[in-house]
Structures are given as structure tokens and as C-alpha cells.
């Protein structure tokens, strides 16, 4: 454990957040947790964490506060709302943001913390909830060097790799959006190949074998298996979250004046799947739209 960091506040206990929080506890840190749905706090409270009634209460006395939330607005509300983190966070404390947010939101958070006298470190994560549970996430970390050093032991508690990407927090979020775009594009392409294979007489297990051999990435292999089996109810990351992420990269690419032509294709297919009532299923359910477009049922 870090010689200076003892107390961690944690806000957001969804599938990812709860897994990250458990690993922080396992690393020996004192943990105070907050979640809007209070029932989600109970398993961690039963395991020894303190429960808080607001983000501000979770931040009170904390050396590091970690947020794992849904989107820009939920993070801004938790940080700067009426009962937000900044109401109680002490000067010099560090806010570690794991949420996939826009670069614009990251710049806003950095400015809010600078005005408050605290530090913001962007540390968005790559990996599904099962990877988070195993403490094997990849974190892209950006912020002031001293702040990164102070929160390093906390980030390491749930990450197999914490990759430093500079002093500007928004850069870490831009990198996360780029990685999400790449993965979502590849997942969609794999789905297209499965649909082509089904109509061309290729056995799904043979295609799956090729994919497992050629793409040595556990996340892509998992998505390929889900599509082959059409297994979308055991949700790791839901389609609504995936739609949010691809919209973020489209917005960021517009701001940067860097066209990403395939991103709009991925977004529209995800949006079509949501319109068909599939938003709460695993993000790989976009494969069902590919099958539909190919005339498969």
C-alpha cells in the first residue's frame, strides 16, 4: 500500500465499479462507497467498507476519490453538484476518473479541481467486468506527475497495466475513445464475417477457431464466442453504453476535425438495435442487426 494514501472514496457501483472497488479493498485501503441505488452499496459495506449518503460524504477525509459512472453528466453531477465531491474533498486530494467521458468533460473536471486546489487524474479503463473482477484492467493514466504518483497504488489495485499518457487528462479520454472505436469496429466486422459464413456454408465453429487463432485478445475472443452462440443476455457491457461511447468518439472526431467514416456506420447499427428493444443486452447483440440485414433469422 502507498505510504501516504490510506482512505479512498468510491462513487459508482455498477458492474465495473463494484469490481474495481472490491480490488481496492483487497489491496488494504480504507474504503467509503456511494451509489445512487443504495442497495448496491450493501455487499461492499458487508465486506467492511463504509457507506455514504452522498458523493460529498464519500469524499470527506479521502486521500483519493475514484468515480466509475455512466457518462459526462453523471460525473459532473457527482463532482460539482449540490452534494458533489468538491463540497468535502480536501485540497491536495486526487480524483481518479475511470469513466469513459468526452475530452471536453475531462477538461472541465481538470479546471474544477484546479480551482478547488485538488487534482484530477484521468484513468479510463479497458476491459469487461470479469476482467475488472480479476484486477486485470488496462488503465490509461494522465495528469500531473505528482498526482499520478500519489494515486498509483490505488490504480494498480485493479489494473494489470497503468499506462501513462502525459500530463493532460483529456488525452487519456481521447485514447480510450479511440480504443473503443477500434474494438467496436472489429466486433462489427466479426459479426459480418459470421453472417457471410452462415450464408456461405462455413461452419460457425470453424470460423470461431480461425478468429480465436488470429485474434489473440480475450475480449475479441469473448465477443466472437457470444456471436457464434447468439448469447447476449449474460451482459458484460450493455448496448446502450456502447452506443454512448461511439457517439462520444463521433463528437470528439468532429471537434478535432478528424473524420472517422466507419464510426457513423457502427453508431447507426447500434441505434437500430436499440430501436428494436435490444439496448439492455450485451453490446455484441449488434450482430442480430447484421443477421437481419443478411436475411437471416
Model-flagged regions — what are they?
Residues 169-294:
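Helical "substrate-binding/catalytic lid" subdomain
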Amino acid at each position: 500500500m502507498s505510504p501516504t494514501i490510506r482512505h479512498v472514496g468510491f462513487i459508482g457501483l455498477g458492474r465495473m465499479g463494484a469490481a474495481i472497488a472490491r480490488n481496492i479493498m483487497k489491496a488494504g485501503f480504507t474504503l467509503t462507497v456511494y451509489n445512487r441505488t443504495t442497495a448496491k452499496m450493501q455487499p461492499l459495506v458487508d465486506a467492511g467498507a463504509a457507506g455514504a449518503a452522498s458523493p460529498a460524504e464519500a469524499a470527506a477525509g479521502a486521500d483519493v476519490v475514484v468515480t466509475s459512472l455512466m457518462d459526462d453528466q453523471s460525473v459532473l453531477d457527482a463532482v460539482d453538484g449540490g452534494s458533489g465531491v468538491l463540497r468535502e474533498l480536501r485540497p491536495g486530494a486526487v480524483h481518479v476518473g475511470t469513466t469513459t467521458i468526452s475530452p471536453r468533460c475531462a477538461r472541465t473536471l481538470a479546471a474544477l479541481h484546479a480551482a478547488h486546489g485538488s487534482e484530477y487524474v484521468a484513468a479510463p479503463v479497458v476491459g469487461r467486468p470479469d476482467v475488472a473482477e480479476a484486477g486485470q484492467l488496462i488503465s490509461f493514466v494522465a495528469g500531473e506527475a505528482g498526482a499520478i504518483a500519489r494515486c498509483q497504488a490505488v490504480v494498480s489495485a485493479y489494473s494489470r497495466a497503468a499506462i501513462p499518457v502525459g500530463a493532460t487528462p483529456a488525452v487519456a479520454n481521447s485514447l480510450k475513445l479511440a480504443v473503443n472505436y477500434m474494438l467496436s469496429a472489429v466486433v462489427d466486422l466479426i459479426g459480418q464475417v459470421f453472417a457471410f459464413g452462415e450464408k456461405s456454408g462455413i461452419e460457425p465453429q470453424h470460423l470461431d477457431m480461425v478468429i480465436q487463432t488470429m485474434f489473440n485478445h480475450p475480449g475479441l475472443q469473448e465477443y466472437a464466442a457470444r456471436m457464434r452462440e447468439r448469447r447476449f443476455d449474460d451482459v458484460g457491457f450493455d448496448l446502450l453504453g456502447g452506443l454512448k461511447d461511439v457517439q462520444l468518439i463521433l463528437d470528439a472526431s468532429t471537434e478535432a476535425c478528424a473524420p472517422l467514416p466507419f464510426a457513423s456506420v457502427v453508431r447507426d447499427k447500434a441505434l437500430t438495435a436499440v430501436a428494436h428493444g435490444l439496448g439492455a443486452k450485451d453490446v455484441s447483440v449488434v450482430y442480430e442487426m447484421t443477421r437481419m440485414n443478411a436475411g437471416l433469422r
